[in-house]
Amino acid sequence: MIPIAHIENDFPTKFGIPRQSGRVGALKARIVFEPEYRNVDACRGLEEFSHIWLIWEFSEAKRTKWSPTVRPPRLGGNVRKGVFATRSPFRPNSIGLSCVKLEKVALDEPDSPVLYVEGADLMNGTPIFDIKPYIPYADCHPEATGSFTEYSKDHHLNVEFPQELLERIPGESREALIAVLADDPRPAYQNDPERSYGMPFGEKDIHFRVDGDILRVYNVTEFVKKQQESRADCGK
């Protein structure tokens, strides 16, 4: 498949990305079409839908071999489930599926059409293979059950972010950042209160520790891109 677009957002690495789309609605992103598909007619009528589906590639999680079972982080990393019973990025075909809110379709920008979306769970630069409208009567199933994923859907942390550190974050990004931290960006099996984490967000590196249900930010520094290779991968 050939990418038709890519996403632009504040996640330069995999660490910290919400584990599911829609978990952090305050996250904003741009979807920019590749030149061959940059045609306003291709998006005609899309603005009439409130949400869209993104079909994309786990471009940073490719493997030459696949395993029939994986260990979901939310089960502590020790329990195996069939790969098709999870949303693990390590799949025979590294394809992701996300439902996001469509904020607007911009037609007056140099690289138009540009889609502004909220609640995406993709890394900056992720290639997108297709975009489809979300159809409520067909796509919504209130009676659906979610197996082991139900156990962590309400898990949140209380975030303590000193004002002097918060002021280092651009004003328009603060709400989204706090929501990402509250969603607990750590791998689920890491619970050491003395452990320090560094989460890249935009052009900053957010340093924090977690003790119980409290996440404390203790420093905000400039993000150095070469650090990317050493980041932990939260998975899905």
Can you name each region flagged by the protein language model?
Residues 8, 100-103:
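Conserved positions in beta-strands of structured domains
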Residues 1-95, 107-116, 120-236:
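Mixed-charge, low-complexity intrinsically disordered regions
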